[in-house]
Amino acid sequence: TERGDYVAILGANTLGIIAAELCIYYQLVPIVIDVDETKLSLAENHGIYYTINPSKADVRQRIIEITGGKLAEFTLYEPRSNMLPNYIPSITQEGGTVAVIGYNYFLSNLQLNLGDVLEKQLNVTAVKNGYGEFNTAINLLANKVINTEGFIDSVIKFDDIGRELPRISEDKYAYGKVVVDCM
């Protein structure tokens, strides 16, 4: 990667926004794409300048405008974001890199047209975790490179776990991040 490279990020969920913040830290230009205006607003509050809502704008055309016609050198796809991967070939430049980030045990079948990937000679990789990067992660958090504001959906007291977890597990999609207060 080089300073100023464009990184398209499909998904403005927690991992997508953190990835965008890391892009800024490493002097890359993130472009976050999501259909959820609330998530895009959160991304903007985290300092992400370029956001695109596919229901309001043509994603490829907007990427062309932002990048001056180059398209994104890198595209990150977060499967839990509920974004479809069909944008990947149209927004990633020829010879670019696509990374599937995060892990979703519900994801059994990711459909991407291999012909489009081969035609553009895209490099496809996967990043499941940050094993071995714990110290770096703590350092980034301690130095406030990563802003966690708005990520925590609920805080429960340790003594209330027995009562609260069944309620939370009834609708696992209603709660993104839950913190247990042990103090």
Give residue ranges: language-model regions.
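Aromatic/hydrophobic pocket-lining residues that form π-stacking "cages" and hydrophobic walls in ligand
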Residues: 15, 19, 39, 63, ...
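C-terminal hydrophobic helical "lid"/dimerization subdomain
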Residues: 86-90, 131-183
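Structural detector of well-ordered beta-strand residues that form the stable sheet scaffold
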Residues: 8, 31, 97-99, 125, ...
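E1/E1-like adenylate-forming module used to activate ubiquitin-like modifiers
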Residues: 121, 127-130
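Mid-domain Rossmann-like dinucleotide-binding core that forms the NAD(H)/NADP(H) cofactor-binding site
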Residues: 1-56
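Glycine-rich cofactor phosphate-binding loops and adjacent beta1-alpha1 units
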Residues: 1-3, 41, 46-121
